Regions:
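Surface-exposed, charge/polar-rich loops and edge strands
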Residues: 1-200
């Protein structure tokens, strides 16, 4: 079952991520049906509300993912702006992606609250990896939507992530391989029984 679930998830990610981008205002129905779809939104970043997700690695180097609040149409969302390298030691803060508060257009993948990357948020309880957006909202005293954006690019190129959030590895893993082996084995057994009956 794990292999089948993973295969279905991988298929969904692959199909959604290959669709052309769509403007946020053109989305209709349940927002969950657009997870992993590339969307565009116009608004402004609020650099007074930023958070770092620690325990993130890139090319073997320790770092963080930088999340910044984004304001649009009287609504708020968190935007994952990609990986930033940690400072030389615990006392040196990382060099964050630049932010300005001018109105810009951003392009990114729509993600659901429950699919936030694993890790630990600064100043946020790590008791659960679920509903982390809600935890961020409570810590920062804001109310955001129940989705967030993995930033891909911005109309102001200086705000493009140096290391964007990558799609998860789309591997079905060993569970699917085992499942296919069992299906193949079962087929051989059925075929063998029929062959025995014919020769009997």
């Amino acid at each position: 079952e794990r292999g089948i679930d993973r295969h279905a998830r991988n298929t969904l990610i692959e199909e959604q991520s290959e669709l052309p981008p769509v403007a946020f205002q053109d989305l209709t129905g349940d927002i969950a049906t657009y997870e992993w779809r590339k969307i565009s939104i116009e608004g402004t970043f609020d650099d007074s509300n930023q958070i770092l997700l620690r325990n993130r690695y890139h090319d073997g180097m320790y770092g963080f993912e930088q999340l910044t609040l984004f304001l649009f149409d009287d609504r708020k969302i968190w935007v994952d702006r990609g990986w930033v390298k940690a400072g030389s030691d615990a006392t040196v803060p990382p060099q964050l992606q630049p932010t300005n508060e001018q109105r810009i257009s951003i392009n990114g993948r729509l993600r659901l609250d429950s699919s936030l990357p694993q890790g630990k948020f600064f100043a946020v309880s790590n008791d659960s990896q679920r509903n982390l957006v809600s935890q961020l909202d409570a810590r920062k005293g804001v109310q955001t939507e129940n989705f967030y954006i993995d930033l891909i690019s911005a109309s102001d190129s200086t705000m493009n992530p140096d290391v964007p959030v990558e799609l998860p590895e789309l591997s079905d893993g060993p569970h699917m391989a085992y499942a296919l082996q069992w299906v193949f084995f079962a087929g051989l057994v059925i075929y063998g029984r029929r062959l025995i009956r014919k020769t009997a």
